[in-house]
Amino acid sequence: VDGTWMTELKVTIQGELFKHLLIHCVLPYSNWEWGRVAQSESLSAVRLGLQSSLCKLGYVPEWVQTDNSSAATRRLGVAEEGEEGKTRGYTVGYLQLLEHYGLKAQSTHVGNPNENGDVESQNGGLKQAVKQHLLLRGSREFARIDEYEAFLFAVMEKRNRSRQERLAEEIAVMKPVTATPLATSIEKKVRVSSGSLIQVQRRSYSVPTSLIKKEVTV
């Protein structure tokens, strides 16, 4: 599973450039792929992308490999060799997600993102396919995000048609999905500061001054 930025495709939603990425899941043998649109590589986005892919596939692989994004891993310390030697461990939320589906975690080594080569290669291939389908469509403008996402689904469906033979070999050794999907969003209560700001996942957001010192749900 990997988050790949798609903003370079210059897709617009109601005339505005849509800055977004795709949480992209790929099976390494068949190259079967699926993904969901997100606007940051957060744990919620990874949860949405992974769960949607598992539900679409209908089966659960043994392992899930990811890079060292902050959605899945956190820094544990710095090794003697310096910056590239930083070690990372999995976040609690990511491990809980995998445990829910009976998956094992595997990540690339810090400084070696090319170890996630299968999905990285498919990222480029999918972007090229989307570019071609946008040209055939004659427009990069969409009325809504879900309309654009449906367009992406159709592109991935088409690419997956030629992968069915190898896919059958992969799912033959997998277990069916039996777990109920987890919620893809998390509600949290926070108090508005005297400066009319709230802190959510280490980021500050401005809210109306009428909410100062009040507790709000985000």
PLM features per residue range, with description:
Residues 74-79, 117-121, 169-172:
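Short acidic, glycine/serine/threonine-rich loops at helix termini
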Residues 59-86, 110:
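Acidic/histidine-rich, metal-coordinating catalytic segments
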Residues 87-103, 127-138:
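Acidic, His- and aromatic-enriched active-site or binding-groove loops in soluble protein domains
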Residues 1-33, 44-45, 188-199:
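Mobile-element integrase/transposase regions
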